[in-house]
């Protein structure tokens, strides 16, 4: 295993081979930490967070027999990013109007005025 923290960073997903202790990442090759939407671009319900977490667990289990690598983490991160886009498109997630920046990174909101 690696002596450095492996990580995947997308716009809305961060995955680390680490645990969080006192706001610091501590290397732990037997543990993956998932940080969802670190910039709070979206308004999340408990149900939508659970869906992302469950899908994350499913993706990790599918990779259980493979060596953990940067590529594997990037693949999981990309699939989670696509899943979040689907939640937004399906209306299970919405943009956070109190977000620091409104950049609509996954496309304009689907409203009656824009359809």
From Swiss-Prot:
Keyword NAD in record: yes
Organism listed in the record: Prochlorococcus marinus (strain NATL1A)
GO cellular component, one term: plasma membrane-derived thylakoid membrane
Subunit structure: NDH-1 can be composed of about 15 different subunits; different subcomplexes with different compositions have been identified which probably have different functions.
Protein's UniProt name: NAD(P)H-quinone oxidoreductase subunit M
InterPro entries, per the entry: NdhM
Family: Belongs to the complex I NdhM subunit family.
Single Gene Ontology MF annotation: quinone binding
Localization, UniProt: Cellular thylakoid membrane
Catalytic activity, reaction form: a plastoquinone + NADH + (n+1) H(+)(in) = a plastoquinol + NAD(+) + n H(+)(out); a plastoquinone + NADPH + (n+1) H(+)(in) = a plastoquinol + NADP(+) + n H(+)(out)
Keywords, ordered alphabetically: Membrane, NAD, NADP, Plastoquinone, Quinone, Thylakoid, Translocase, Transport
Keyword rRNA-binding on entry: no
Membrane topology: Peripheral membrane protein
Record function comment: NDH-1 shuttles electrons from an unknown electron donor, via FMN and iron-sulfur (Fe-S) centers, to quinones in the respiratory and/or the photosynthetic chain. The immediate electron acceptor for the enzyme in this species is believed to be plastoquinone. Couples the redox reaction to proton translocation, and thus conserves the redox energy in a proton gradient. Cyanobacterial NDH-1 also plays a role in inorganic carbon-concentration.
EC numbers: 7.1.1.-
């Amino acid at each position: 295993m690696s002596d450095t923290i492996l990580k995947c960073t997308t716009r809305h997903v961060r995955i680390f081979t680490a645990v969080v202790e006192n706001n610091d990442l501590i290397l732990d090759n037997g543990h993956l930490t998932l940080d969802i939407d670190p910039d709070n671009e979206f308004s999340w319900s408990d149900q939508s967070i659970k869906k992302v977490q469950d899908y994350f667990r499913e993706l990790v289990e599918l990779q259980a027999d493979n060596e953990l690598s940067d590529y594997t983490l990037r693949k999981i991160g990309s699939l989670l990013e696509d899943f979040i886009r689907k939640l937004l498109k399906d209306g299970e997630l919405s943009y956070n109007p109190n977000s620091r920046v409104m950049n609509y990174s996954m496309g304009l909101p689907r409203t009656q005025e824009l359809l």
